[in-house]
Regions:
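Long C-terminal interaction/binding lobes of large macromolecular proteins
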Residues: 136, 154
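RNA pseudouridine synthases
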Residues: 1-127, 140-143, 147-148, 192, ...
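Pseudouridine synthases involved in rRNA/tRNA modification
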Residues: 1-14, 20-26, 130, 144-151, ...
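A structural micro-motif recognizing beta-strand termini
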Residues: 99, 155-159
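Well-ordered beta-strand positions in beta-sheet-rich domains
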Residues: 93-95, 106, 110, 133-135, ...
Length: 219
């Protein structure tokens, strides 16, 4: 990890932070500093000890995925945000680089996702899995150059929220994400997946909120 998290949005009920690559959202028992630790320390520095204690992440990103992570700051409104997660009321868009030239312009990938029985780290497409939908739109097809293979720059909208959903769905289409060490080929650049934006109606104020995190890499 070589960058500090950045606050993108904050009010009395919600905080959005731009997570850098290499940082985990929740503790894994190793004592490694997490994005939740960062957010809690920031709230304490702002003099808001209650929020620092009550805060809960509303979404999670894999270690190498960058971008928007939302935190609920107030116990009284936490159930409203939890219900929004259940209802898929957050519109989430990701930017990603996929291997190869995708020959369609837009597609709804509708394939159930289950745990991989042969590798506990992985998920897989399988009939026994949970319903999973990912909408993919090709933004640009990048021709091979300077020794780099052909790649596709894509916008991805999550319609459900399964573990590794984007990675599994793109790999199932034979276009794994660039740098994916589980479902594709590991590369020094790391995983090219960025949680770019979140849009929703604020459950307390009724405002339409749109939050964006700048993409840390160029397609």
């Amino acid at each position: 990890m070589n960058e500090e998290p950045q606050v993108l949005y904050c009010d009395a009920w919600l905080m959005a932070i731009d997570k850098p690559a290499g940082m985990i959202v929740h503790g894994d028992g190793t004592g490694e500093r997490t994005l939740t630790d960062y957010a809690s320390d920031l709230l304490l520095a702002m003099g808001d000890g209650f929020a620092a204690t009550d805060m809960q992440p509303l979404n999670r990103l894999d270690r190498d995925t960058t971008g928007v992570v939302l935190f609920s700051l107030d116990k009284q409104t936490q159930p409203a945000f939890d219900q929004m997660v259940i209802d898929h009321a957050f519109e989430k868009h990701y930017l990603a680089l996929a291997e190869g030239k995708i020959d369609w312009n837009e597609k709804l990938i509708d394939k159930p996702i289950a745990r991989d029985r042969h590798d506990s780290r992985k998920m897989r497409v399988g009939a026994s899995g949970k319903p999973s939908q990912t909408r993919v739109k090709v933004l640009k097809r990048l021709k091979s150059r300077r020794g780099l293979p052909t790649r596709s720059y894509i916008d991805v909208e999550l319609l459900t929220g399964r573990k590794h959903q984007i990675r599994v769905h793109l790999a199932s289409e034979r276009h794994p994400l660039v740098g994916d060490d589980l479902y594709g080929t590991p590369l020094p650049c790391g995983l090219m997946l960025h949680a770019h934006s979140v849009s929703f109606t604020h459950p307390v104020t009724g405002e339409h909120i749109h939050i964006e995190a700048p993409c840390p890499w160029e397609p």
